[in-house]
Structure formats: C-alpha cells, structure tokens
Amino acid sequence: MAREKKTCVECGHKVKSLFIQYSPGNFRLMKCENCEEVADEYVECELLIIFIDLILHKTKAYRHLLYNVVNQESANVQHLLWKLVLAYLLLDTYRSLLLRRTNDGSNVSMSFLFESLEVLVNVLSANFAFVFSFAFAAKLMLVMPRGKEILLTILISSYVKIFLFAMPVWEFPVSVIFIVDMLVLTSNAVALKVMTESATSRCLAVCFIAHSIRFLVDQISGHLGSVM
C-alpha cells in the first residue's frame, strides 16, 4: 500500500512526510520542497493554538485540519461523516430551539411533541435546501472535488456552532446567534477555498448563496408551522 502523502500548510504542495521521529518525543519537522518552509508547524502545537488559528480563519490551520489530521482517503471517513452529520443537525436543532424560546418568551402552550416535530421539520428542510443550493452553486462557480470531500469540509468548518452552548450560561442577546451564523459562513468559505484552491470571492459567493437560501427556507418553514 502506498504511503499517504501529507500537505504543506504554507503553500498546499504535497509532501512525503511532516516529520521524522528518532525516538519517542524526539522528532524533526520536515520542510516543503516547494516553498522551503516547515511543512506543518501545527504538528508540535497545542490544540488550543490550532483552535485559535481556526477562529482567526488562517488557511494554514484549515489545511492542517482538512489534509493532515482528517484522512479523507481512509475507510473510516464514512463513519466520521455520519458522526459529523448527526452533530451538525443536533447543533442546528439547538439553535432553532434557542431562537424559538427567545421569540416565544414563556409561551408553553404548545405541546412538547408538536414543538419538537416542528423544529425537526424546520431543521431538516432548511439543511436539505442548504446542501442542494450549495452543491448547485459550487458546480457552477468552482472546480469541484468529490462531493463527499466537500460535505466533510462544510461539516468540519461549521465547528463555530459550538459557541451556541455558551448563550444560556452568559445570557447573551439573540443577536449573538446571527453573529455565530456569519462566522460559520466565513469559516465555510475559507475551508472551501482551501479544498478547491478557488478565488476567495467565488467561495464567499457560493457560501452566501447557500446560507441565504437556507435562511429563507427556515423562515418560510417556521412561518408555515406557526399558522398551522
């Protein structure tokens, strides 16, 4: 079996290896033959440093995560994909519940079962529209890799949604939800740029179109549910 190649986080060029390990805890980082920089400085960084650079939307951090951490050619990637889909839908459901509770205040007249069903329908319909519109816009505007790789990229780069869990703790205003939504959009665009090597403007346009359609479908679905 051929050894899997890694990617230089500086220029995106393929490299044979990221480091040479001489003994446990003793290794040397390799340089990229193309740009002559250290291929992946994040190998020896703490997870917190990587997370901060992801929040800052550094392309180096996204290359490290998408190419050198996640092995998209692995047989286990399908298992990872299903886990990410579930986590993404759960976070989106939590977002919808936060918005609903904020807008409805203390209204508890709606049964829990009906409310849960309505939220589930809203989340599934909005995300179906998001994936469909994203795939359509990307096909028109970008050089597309495989669909599975793009889906994995979007799911991973939506990690910003985890900040929604901080809202009930610190009692943030509802506007924070929309700030998180904007961060998810820009994070998706950076990850898409890394995966497709397309212009930033095109990647932003694709993500803006997909997120806008998702927002519209979510609003329409929520309105239909409220009048039923």
Swiss-Prot record:
Glycans are attached at residue 107. Restricted to tissues in which cells are actively dividing or expanding. Mostly expressed in roots and flowers, and, to a lower extent, in stems and leaves. GO terms for cellular component: endoplasmic reticulum; endoplasmic reticulum membrane. InterPro entries: Arv1 (IPR007290). It holds the Pfam family Arv1. Keywords: Endoplasmic reticulum, Glycoprotein, Lipid metabolism, Lipid transport, Membrane, Sphingolipid metabolism, Transmembrane, Transmembrane helix, Transport. It is found in: Endoplasmic reticulum membrane. It comes from the Eukaryota. The chain crosses the membrane at residues 37-57, 80-100, 123-143, 150-170, 176-196. It is a multi-pass membrane protein. GO terms for biological process: intracellular sterol transport; sphingolipid metabolic process; sterol metabolic process. Its main location: endoplasmic reticulum. Mediator of sterol homeostasis involved in sterol uptake, trafficking and distribution into membranes. Also regulates the sphingolipid metabolism. Belongs to the ARV1 family. This is Protein ARV 2. It comes from Arabidopsis thaliana (Mouse-ear cress). The lineage of its organism: Eukaryota, Viridiplantae, Streptophyta, Embryophyta, Tracheophyta. The gene is ARV2.
